[in-house]
Amino acid sequence: LKTFRWTIFFLVLVSASLQAQDRPLLDISIKAFDANLPESSLDQQQSGIYPAVRQAEVRYLPSFLKLMLEESGQWGAVRLLPDLDTGAELQLSATIVSSDGSTLELAIRAIDASGRIWTDKIYTGTAVESVSLNEPVLGTDPFLYLYTAITGDLLMVYQSLTSQDLQGIKDIATLRYGAALAPDVFSPYLNQDESGLYQLTRFPADNDPFLMRIREIREHEYVFIDVVDEQYEDFFVSIKPVYDVWRRYRREMLASEADKVRLEQEQGSDFRRGSYMSLRESYNNYRWSRLQDQYLDEINAGFINEVLPTDITLEDSLFHLSGTLDEQYKEWRGILKELYMLDNPQTP
């Protein structure tokens, strides 16, 4: 806890230092986390993984990280997406290594548009019940220290870059987005070396018609991203109360199991069927089973918005998107690419 307080103090100092500087702010694109879910139900059971909870964490955990980054005030727009963002200035992705309510392990990778890796490691946190910071949402998460470590690492890299570096990242992101739609037009502006890093060969003029159209198409994509973001936010708000309780009871269950093992070792044959401790253990298991069924039902109910269709108006046309958010996002990007090609039939 002492280390946690010093980390918070350090971030406050870094934040104050950065606010005093006139530097370009990078937008962050966060991909919904990889569930890392074993294929067989037996493997899931042996690993103590509940599929409904893990699928909820795929959305919940990045939503909390997004909130942390936004609250720091040191970034541009922070967006949570169902897939990787081809035009991301700073792309963040993660795999849930383990999550049992008591400990949380996330394999985090952050890479900017130039190919520079900001962080690529596993962050591990142990639940801290007493975390508060007088924050109604941020301060109630038992793994706040883990998220603070992630945001702190990102801020350290950001602070190490010059304004020219940051603007270069933003320009490369724009051109990489353009190259995904019209490679023949925008790829010549970029050079990728053997290590995978991108450099600008030159940047098109601001009044370049292709660049202007790409920027317009990008804004159209943000329209759908705003819809996705709203759905993720609704999911986060609706699932947080039951997820918090579920994690707390998971910690209690794990502690109870540890106590049982300890008592069995201490008491040996005295810990027998029909004894008070054995009966209490049976009751706790029954109680946990009933509570778990209730919580899993509520968590499953939180996915209702995941498959709701989306209607979006674009340039006097109405588009109806259906399927999961991931499927809708891919469909929308396909529509935007077709729109670009229709507007630029002579694209080389």
Predicted regions and their residues:
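Bacterial N-terminal signal peptides that target proteins for export
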Residues: 1-7
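Bacterial N-terminal signal peptides
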Residues: 7-15
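Sec/Tat signal peptide C-region and signal peptidase I cleavage site
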Residues: 16-20
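C-terminal/domain-edge helix-coil "capping" segments
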Residues: 21-23, 127-348
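Short hydrophobic beta-strand segments
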Residues: 26-39, 168-175
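A short, hydrophobic beta-strand-centered structural micro-motif
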Residues: 28, 77-108
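An acidic helix/loop motif centered on a single conserved Asp/Glu
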Residues: 30-70
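Amphipathic beta-strand/beta-sheet edge segments enriched in Tyr/Trp
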Residues: 93-133
